[in-house]
């Protein structure tokens, strides 16, 4: 048993993911989390007053009120004023980390019911001018910094995230054609899952304003299901000459949020919640930052070891698709079964709003595991700076 107490997921919802500068661009990360949290509270029949803690992961802090994010989410959805809130940042693992931190609070009996979430509005990432607060020298050429682009570069190793994926492509002999074929598969699997309604249980529709008036958004906006291999092959590589990473086989810059409500076994019984899944275990691992994308390998292995399970026990595996060569390197290193890995597509198709992806992956695994009648699933993400995080869940149906 990897956890000291039984911890159960009693609700798991996410917003549709918006394209960069798309339908969700005017919603802050706080707004997006509020939508997901309200949907989760409603779906799980969880009264807000039963929430003991609010934990939300967010990376870019792109809105002016971002410092208050988790607190504002809690207050907006009716969580008692006396209940504390925490906004955390483990980069692309932040959505997963919110659940991990929630489990830790429950296991230490600091909380019984925790509203967890992950969120990002990449569209709202501002441009900034640094070092002007105390005046500038005559003639100084002020530089306008794109905080989004700057945030996707690891200054410690002086590499943009895309180059760490190129390093993995070289290390694991991943070709450009491999990457484009995988990107096409991600789009096609997303299309099939979307048309079959496999995202319906996790989705929290949002009313958005368009040129044609208000409409309900309930489908991921970034996905390009009509993409062909020929189109992908024509795209130029972005980070190095004759490289593998293109705009078509990398995760999409996007906006979105997810909310996962977890509760102790005692709380499930006390409040008569319906458990959807049990949190079996988790693991966080560091790795070489120049190949940060390999992080899911030690993370998944660590989580499985703690839980006394193996990859063969997993009915579903979901590894965040930061870049196609990154995912393919993880797949090769772990010898993942393609038939049960990223079965509904991933971030290459639907986008990767940094803090939101862990919550999205968890929500999808919860509902997809139940739909398929499977037992175990593991979700994982690589993390900029050289980390990996993994979370194992068990179907309770």
Curated annotation (Swiss-Prot):
Chain positions found as Phosphotyrosine: 127
InterPro entries the UniProt entry points to: Thiolase, Thiolase-like, Thiolase_acyl_enz_int_AS, Thiolase_AS, Thiolase_C, Thiolase_CS, Thiolase_N
Listed EC numbers: 2.3.1.16, 2.3.1.9, 3.1.2.-, 3.1.2.1
Sites of Phosphothreonine modification: 119, 136
Modified residues (N6-succinyllysine): 25, 45, 137, 143, 158, 171, 191, 209, 211-212, 214, 234, 240, 305, 312
Gene3D superfamilies hit by this protein: 3.40.47.10
Catalytic reaction(s) noted: an acyl-CoA + acetyl-CoA = a 3-oxoacyl-CoA + CoA; 2 acetyl-CoA = acetoacetyl-CoA + CoA; acetyl-CoA + H2O = acetate + CoA + H(+); propanoyl-CoA + H2O = propanoate + CoA + H(+)
Any one of the GO CC terms: nuclear body
Alphabetically ordered keywords of this record: Acetylation, Acyltransferase, Fatty acid metabolism, Hydrolase, Lipid metabolism, Mitochondrion, Phosphoprotein, Transferase, Transit peptide
Modified residues (N6-acetyllysine): 25, 137, 143, 158, 171, 191, 209, 234, 241, 269-270, 305, 312, 340, 375
Site (Increases nucleophilicity of active site Cys): 352
Annotated positions of the Phosphoserine modification: 28, 121, 310, 344
Keyword Transferase listed: yes
Subunit record text: Homotetramer. Interacts with BNIP3.
Family: Belongs to the thiolase-like superfamily. Thiolase family.
Function: In the production of energy from fats, this is one of the enzymes that catalyzes the last step of the mitochondrial beta-oxidation pathway, an aerobic process breaking down fatty acids into acetyl-CoA. Using free coenzyme A/CoA, catalyzes the thiolytic cleavage of medium- to long-chain unbranched 3-oxoacyl-CoAs into acetyl-CoA and a fatty acyl-CoA shortened by two carbon atoms. Also catalyzes the condensation of two acetyl-CoA molecules into acetoacetyl-CoA and could be involved in the production of ketone bodies. Also displays hydrolase activity on various fatty acyl-CoAs.
Protein name: 3-ketoacyl-CoA thiolase, mitochondrial
Organism of provenance: Mus musculus (Mouse)
Organism ancestry: Eukaryota, Metazoa, Chordata, Craniata, Vertebrata
